[in-house]
């Protein structure tokens, strides 16, 4: 395994849509995966809000996001998440002030090829795990998958 890590600081987090076609696929309460429950400091039996979104290019999904939101945040399944999730969290009183991310790349599994409507062999996917907190309080945990062919990740820390 080859790994690279870096640490830096930034002034908040915000999403820019850049005219992307980002769609909310679902908003529901569910039991969290164990790593999400551990990050939030809750039992895996405590339901959390799960937000599923996808970004489309030419009517095909190129990014899949599954975000879990800490139950302390006053949002629910009726909240409109069609805009920026970070703006919504800030409006709820929990601006994201710190982010930790893990980024890996692998070949697509059969399930991922179905999700992204890919028929080719040996297609790459980038997996990204992001944990966001507000003043050291864990707020969101997101699993993201990106079709890696031609994908560029730009991190602009200020």
Where are these regions (language model features)?
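Broad gene-expression machinery/nucleic-acid interaction feature
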Residues: 24, 48-50, 64, 125-127, ...
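A short beta-strand signature
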Residues: 44-58, 125-132
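A short, well-structured catalytic beta-strand-centered motif of the EAL phosphodiesterase domain
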Residues: 41, 66-69, 143-146
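Short, solvent-exposed beta-strand/turn "edge" segments of beta-rich domains on protein surfaces
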Residues: 39-45, 56, 117-121
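Bacterial carbohydrate/catabolite-sensing allosteric modules
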Residues: 19, 60, 137
């Amino acid at each position: 395994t080859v790994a690279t890590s870096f640490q830096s600081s930034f002034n908040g987090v915000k999403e820019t849509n850049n005219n992307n076609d980002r769609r909310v696929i679902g908003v529901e309460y569910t039991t969290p995966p164990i790593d999400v429950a551990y990050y939030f400091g809750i039992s895996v039996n405590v339901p959390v809000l799960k937000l599923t979104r996808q970004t489309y290019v030419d009517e095909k999904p190129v990014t899949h996001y599954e975000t879990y939101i800490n139950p302390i945040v006053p949002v629910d399944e009726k909240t409109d998440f069609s805009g920026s999730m970070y703006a919504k969290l800030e409006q709820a009183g929990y601006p994201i002030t710190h982010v930790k991310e893990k980024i890996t790349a692998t070949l697509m599994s059969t399930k991922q090829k179905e999700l992204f409507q890919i028929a080719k062999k040996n297609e790459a996917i980038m997996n990204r795990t992001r944990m966001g907190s507000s003043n050291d309080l864990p707020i969101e945990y997101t699993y993201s998958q990106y079709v890696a062919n031609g994908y560029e990740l730009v991190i602009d820390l200020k």
